[in-house]
């Protein structure tokens, strides 16, 4: 990972015409870009620094100039820009070649990063560009037909399973949407996929780009923040420590199963991710603790963790981001409620 202490000297050594960086709306990567920009300026370097939003289909600053509060407000803005689904040009090789002067010291590179190496790697998902492409194709061939109707049932294998590839830059959302649309099969599935991969995903980036408090209660709408505060001291029938949650030692089998899948596989079904976070709100000493725990566990174990979608999912579940007020009840206040009985009605929990 090249930072402000490396980039100016490297750009000078390579006689680069410009420095180009990707875009992430999250706080830490945004700070990295600011630090590199500042270092170039301090070094008296006149090379321009370009930031390209390859994270989204439509650049986040092009879609909207403010925080969008609902999917329905950003949806027409995304669909109004089909020009961003134009053909991706073939990469033209340059004459520099790929030979390296010396082998990279990957252990040194890894040691320079703040990583939690206690979480074991998983085997079920093949990484890299080829693994991502193969996984997307298997979705188109086998699961797209059921995506619209069955993707909310954890018992069905109807999800795309590409969120980790998108998160790690092994697959672009633009390429994924274009390939799914080009399949010309299962129009309901295609529509549902575009909603998730384009509208919902870019709504998450919009939140993190324009709301600096995307990971704390200050980022909530007034109605949600006030409601949670009113009910912050409500009596909880069940409360658990972070360790008990992490080790899936609660009284509820469904929640424990979801948590165990998260720890063992680095994933959790999308519907259960909502339920999982709602229960953490119900079983934590306070809403602030609940949000911190959701983000901690999500980022530690999810293959698609530390991503705008993850922060937004936690924020939706705990503090009502992109949602409206619901019937007031203990602990949750006006935040949308989910419970075990509702899951039993929706799918076979056994």
Regions of interest found by a model, annotated:
Residues 4-8, 147-150, 227-232:
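Short hydrophobic/aromatic-rich motifs at helix boundaries and adjacent loops
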Residues 1-92, 189, 260, 279-313:
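Trp/Phe/Arg-rich N-terminal binding region typifying the photolyase-homology
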Residues 153-349:
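Active-site-proximal binding-pocket segments
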């Amino acid at each position: 990972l090249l930072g402000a202490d490396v980039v100016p000297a490297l750009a000078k050594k390579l006689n680069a015409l410009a420095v180009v960086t990707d875009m992430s709306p999250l706080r830490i990567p945004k700070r990295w870009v600011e630090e590199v920009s500042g270092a170039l300026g301090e070094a008296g370097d006149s090379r321009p620094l370009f930031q390209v939003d390859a994270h989204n289909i439509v650049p986040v600053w092009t879609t909207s100039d403010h925080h969008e509060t609902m999917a329905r407000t950003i949806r027409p803005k995304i669909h109004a820009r089909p020009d961003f689904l134009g053909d991706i040009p073939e990469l033209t090789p340059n004459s520099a070649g790929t030979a390296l002067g010396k082998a990279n010291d990957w252990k040194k590179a890894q040691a320079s990063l703040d990583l939690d190496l206690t979480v074991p790697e998983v085997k079920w998902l093949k990484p890299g560009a080829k693994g991502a492409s193969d996984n997307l194709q298997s979705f188109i061939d086998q699961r797209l037909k059921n995506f619209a109707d069955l993707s909310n049932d954890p018992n069905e294998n109807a999800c795309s399973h590409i969120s980790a590839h998108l998160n790690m830059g092994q697959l672009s959302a633009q390429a994924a949407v274009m390939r799914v649309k080009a399949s010309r099969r299962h129009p309901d599935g295609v529509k549902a996929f575009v909603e998730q991969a384009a509208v919902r995903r870019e709504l998450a980036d919009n939140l993190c780009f324009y709301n600096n408090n995307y990971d704390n209660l200050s980022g909530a709408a007034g109605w949600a923040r006030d409601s949670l505060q009113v009910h912050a001291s409500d009596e909880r029938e069940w409360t658990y420590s972070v360790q008990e949650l992490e080790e899936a030692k609660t009284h509820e089998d469904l929640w424990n199963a979801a948590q165990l899948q998260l720890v063992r596989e680095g994933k959790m079904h999308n519907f259960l991710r909502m339920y999982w976070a709602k229960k953490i709100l119900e079983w934590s000493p306070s809403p602030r603790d609940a949000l911190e725990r959701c983000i901690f566990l999500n980022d530690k174990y999810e293959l698609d963790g530390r991503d705008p979608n993850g922060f937004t999912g936690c924020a939706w579940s705990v503090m009502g981001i992109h949602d409206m007020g619901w019937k007031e009840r203990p602990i949750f206040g006006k935040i949308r409620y989910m419970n075990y009985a509702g899951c039993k009605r929706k799918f076979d929990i056994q």
